């Protein structure tokens, strides 16, 4: 960095420390990833200076010719990537994308079905602390107590009973394949609209490693980071018949000017995801996650639902007498970054939790393969087996540092 150290040494120091944290720790938060230098360059471009309210060819400001080119490329690439008729690349986040869809098909007080946050859903799917649970009437569905997989019979029963206007499929802490076709059958029976939130699995969907809801559902939303390896942002996919209402719900409905530098970075990420190498990347993400789950099972830990079909693993640490917060904080001390997470039918409050959520996208981007992930999994188990012994913590931290030195982060920095 050339100018920041002098202009704002405090911010510069914090950014350098963050570089060091990412370099010296194993990033295993399932919703995080590392963007390429090309994405980072687009993100830090002079497009951050440009206001471009409206849409390509229909702006409220002059001087938007280049912004139009950028947004049009992002739209076309998103449509190609997911096989969609329509794409809106302006949402600032996945939460904004979800809210735009709600505004497009629901009125205040209308009921909708969404996955229970405590069972792996997302707070924007009807949590009482979120606007989705305050303006509308959410009806939560969950997982089966024995299999810990989505209970489609319960969804059908709730749909018949409540006749919701919208059914939301998608999760933030669910490791199994989602059967979108079953959701479609249920929605058709009760006359409900369908929204799929594929924020976590969009990379798997775009490469064919998870069934796609595009063309089957009325609306599909996603973030552009996580498995897509783009900047933090949102995306809406739908059919052309919904273009007018969705565009108006994003702008001027819930947003003003789009973040054009972010949209430029989204366009770059979409182009990267259209390349053959990206499909190979997702293949390794999945192999790494399966390896991680297998290590945990072999070491006597309980993996929620018994394994994984995607990029994440939900681990029940209560079997070792730990809470999620104890496990996550302890792992952080030895250089492994995860997050505490509730597990289905958790007896602990969310702020404490009984589980941790681990993901493989970031480490796969960094270059780790299944053999490396086996080592990582064993290091995690070594720590959790004896989290309070200083000698054990020191040994595990040394193992983590061996891996981070083997896979440096230079390729993800601009300087």
Swiss-Prot record:
Superkingdom in the source lineage: Bacteria
Catalytic class of the enzyme: transferase
EC number of this enzyme: 2.1.2.1
InterPro entries xrefs: PyrdxlP-dep_Trfase, PyrdxlP-dep_Trfase_major, PyrdxlP-dep_Trfase_small, Ser_HO-MeTrfase, Ser_HO-MeTrfase-like, Ser_HO-MeTrfase_PLP_BS, SHMT-like_dom
Key words, A-Z: Amino-acid biosynthesis, Cytoplasm, One-carbon metabolism, Pyridoxal phosphate, Transferase
Catalytic activity: (6R)-5,10-methylene-5,6,7,8-tetrahydrofolate + glycine + H2O = (6S)-5,6,7,8-tetrahydrofolate + L-serine
Cofactor(s) named in the record: pyridoxal 5'-phosphate
CDD domains xref list: SHMT
Binding locations of (6S)-5,6,7,8-tetrahydrofolate: 117, 121-123
Pfam families: SHMT
Chief subcellular location: cytoplasm
S-S pairs: none
GO annotation, cellular component aspect: cytosol
Any GO molecular function: pyridoxal phosphate binding
Modified residues (N6-(pyridoxal phosphate)lysine): 226
Function field: Catalyzes the reversible interconversion of serine and glycine with tetrahydrofolate (THF) serving as the one-carbon carrier. This reaction serves as the major source of one-carbon groups required for the biosynthesis of purines, thymidylate, methionine, and other important biomolecules. Also exhibits THF-independent aldolase activity toward beta-hydroxyamino acids, producing glycine and aldehydes, via a retro-aldol mechanism.
Assembly, per entry: Homodimer.
NCBIfam families: PRK00011.1
Family membership noted in the UniProt record: Belongs to the SHMT family.
Protein name: Serine hydroxymethyltransferase
Gene transcribed to yield this protein: glyA
